[in-house]
Amino acid sequence: MKKTLHRILYRTLPLEGYLRAVSRLFFLWQRLGLGRRAPETEYVYHLPQLVRAGDTCIDIGANLGYYARTISRLAGPAGRVYAVEPVAPIRKVLSRNLRRCGNTEILPFALGAAAGPVRMGNDSARENGYFGTGRNFVNEGGGRSDVEFTAEMRRGSELFARLPRLDFIKCDIEGYEAVVMEEMRPLLERFRPTALVETG
C-alpha cells in the first residue's frame, strides 16, 4: 500500500511536490504511531531514551527531517541540532520541515574523508518505481546513476571541531557510515556521544 502510494505520488507530482507529500505522510504516520514496527521508521520512537534536553546533536543524512524534528524537540531550546544534508532538492524540503525548530542548523554538505566536490547518485526510481529519499549515495565509482546530484564534501572532524560538546549522533548515509565515523574518530573519542548508526 505504502509503495503503491509512493509510486502514484512520484509519477504525478513534480519532485519538490513529491518530497513535500512524502514528508507530510511520514509525520502523520509518526503522530499516529503507525511506524513503530516498520524497520525503516521504528528507531525514531527510541529517541526519547537517547536525547536529553540541552544536548548537542548531529543528524548526518538528515533527509527530510524525520529524525531531526524529533531530536530538536527533545533537545529543547537549550540544545543544538546540526542537520547535515547534501542533496539540494531534499534540503529545500528539509528546511521547510524544520522551519519551527529554532535550535537547528542545516549544513549543506556530504561528510567524508576528503573535502571538495563529490558526485552523488540515486537509483531507487528504477528499482522501486519511485524516488527513495534515503537512497542517495556517494558515487565513488563514477558510473551513471538514474538521478545525479553534485554536492560539496567536508570532513566532519573539521566541520564540528569547535563544538564545546557532542551528546548524540544519528548517521544514516547509505553505506558510507564507516567512512564518516572513522574520519570523525577524534570527536567521538573526545566527547563519547551516543550514536545511532545504520548498519546494513
Where are these regions (language model features)?
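Phosphate/nucleotide-binding beta-alpha loop and adjacent structural elements of enzyme active sites
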Residues: M1-G200
